[in-house]
Every structure is written in structure tokens, then in C-alpha cells.
């Protein structure tokens, strides 16, 4: 089996890399981003102090949940009128683990297969659009940069939408995490690369271009595994021909797709 390059960041990416190694794979963990705290924590805390003024707090990722918890006072009581919305099962689990102060709040999440994190904004919107009464003041908790699609749908539905950057994604070259020769050897042997966001797809392309330029060599076409059709489309648009879509990043499924 070819080397698997995992670009999913933070704890979830490290956990996937560990699971793949436990299943016998050779893995390079090259996270597309590192997660850092809010650029202006004082300003962020000021917004969070007004949570009671929002009828919906929307978390876009587990990282958003964890970063928000760091910013909230330890003795805070979650406002009873502020519901919580999450994009998938992973974010819902993070909310229950990191926000015990919000245990009494209503948590809105996609059900069934749509609860898979990678299905993201569209799956959550299918639930939010049916809420009665519809949310009127929404706070989206996210990274400094992110997809605007869900906020746009909420505004079209009459909501006043605010976004708060509770964390930052910092990009580092793959060579920050592994030796360039090891990465090039994996690519030369036909690596499988796991990509979990459109932003990560751009990082993968940038790193491959940089490595090719530095080594003055080319490699066979890698196999790409995307977690969302939108990510897969971005990868194909970038020129990658072999792209599989796996909404659930199960280690065995990744191994099978990479064969």
C-alpha cells in the first residue's frame, strides 16, 4: 500500500494518522493548517459576553467549539434563549464535551447520514430552514477565513448574521513537518493524499508545486481522497485525475480507496 499523506489538521488529523498506522499503513501527517487562538481575544470575549442577544450560536467545526470555550468565563451560564447549531456529529460531540455549561441548551444538528461532518453547511441548512420561528439573530463562530455560504442562506431567510473569528488557521510548508526527501519519496511511489476542505486542497497544490520546483522532478499522479463533493471538484479543477469521495474518514475505507 502506498504512503498515505493525512492533511486533516489538529487532533482529528493526528487521530486518523494513528488509526491508519495501527491498520498497517505508512503515514505522513502533514496538516494543512495549525489551529491558533483568536487574533484579538479581548474583542472576541466582548462579543461572547453578548451571547444572550443571539437566538442561535452556530459552530462550524470542533475547533470553533474548543476555541470558544477557551474564551468563555469558567463560571458562565449559557443563555437559555440561545440555541446551539453544529455542522455535524464531530462538532456536536465537541460541543457536549467542551461546553457543559450549555448542556441545557437546544443543540441543532443534521440527522442520520447528513450528520457526517464533511457534508457541512448544506446539511445543516436543510435543518435550519425548517425551524419555526426561524432564527433572527445568529452568531457564527468560525476561523478568521471561511466559507460564507451558510451565512448567506441565513441572511436570505431574514436573519441578522454576525461572524466571530474565535481561531486562526496558520499554514506551514509540508517541510516543516517532515523531511523533503521523505515527502518526495512518498510522492514518487504514488502516495494517497487525504484532503478535508477546499482550503486544504489549495495547500496541497501549493506544496506539490514547491516540492517539484525544489527537486526539479515530477511524480506519478497521486490518489486523492476528499471528504466532500465540493472538495473533490476543487481537486479535479486543479488537475488531479484520481479523486475519491469518502464522507466518513474511517481508516479501513481510506486504505481501501488508496489501493
Report each predicted region and the residues it spans.
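Conserved beta-alpha
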Residues: 1-259
Amino acid at each position: 500500500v502506498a504512503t498515505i499523506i493525512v492533511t486533516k489538521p489538529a487532533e482529528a488529523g493526528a487521530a486518523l494518522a494513528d488509526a491508519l498506522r495501527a491498520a498497517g499503513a505508512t503515514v505522513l501527517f502533514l496538516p494543512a493548517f495549525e489551529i491558533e487562538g483568536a487574533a484579538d481575544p479581548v474583542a472576541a470575549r466582548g462579543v461572547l459576553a453578548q451571547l444572550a442577544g443571539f437566538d442561535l450560536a452556530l459552530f462550524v467545526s470542533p475547533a470553533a467549539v474548543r476555541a470558544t470555550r477557551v474564551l468563555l468565563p469558567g463560571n458562565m451560564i449559557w443563555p437559555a434563549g440561545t440555541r446551539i447549531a453544529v455542522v455535524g456529529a464531530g462538532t456536536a460531540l465537541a460541543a457536549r464535551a467542551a461546553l457543559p455549561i450549555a448542556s441545557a441548551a437546544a443543540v441543532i444538528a443534521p440527522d442520520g447520514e447528513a450528520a457526517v461532518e464533511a457534508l457541512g453547511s448544506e446539511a445543516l441548512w436543510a435543518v435550519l430552514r425548517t425551524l419555526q420561528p426561524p432564527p433572527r439573530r445568529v452568531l457564527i463562530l468560525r476561523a478568521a477565513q471561511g466559507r460564507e455560504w451558510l451565512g448567506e442562506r441565513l441572511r436570505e431567510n431574514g436573519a441578522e448574521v454576525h461572524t466571530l473569528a474565535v481561531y486562526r488557521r496558520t499554514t506551514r510548508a509540508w517541510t516543516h513537518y517532515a523531511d523533503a526527501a521523505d515527502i518526495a519519496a512518498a510522492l514518487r511511489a504514488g502516495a494517497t493524499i487525504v484532503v478535508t476542505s477546499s482550503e486544504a486542497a489549495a495547500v496541497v497544490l501549493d506544496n506539490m508545486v514547491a516540492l517539484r520546483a525544489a527537486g526539479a522532478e515530477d511524480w506519478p499522479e497521486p490518489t486523492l481522497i476528499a471528504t466532500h463533493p465540493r472538495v473533490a471538484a476543487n481537486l479535479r479543477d486543479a488537475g488531479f485525475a484520481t479523486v475519491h469521495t469518502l464522507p466518513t474518514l474511517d481508516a479501513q475505507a481510506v486504505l481501501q480507496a488508496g489501493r
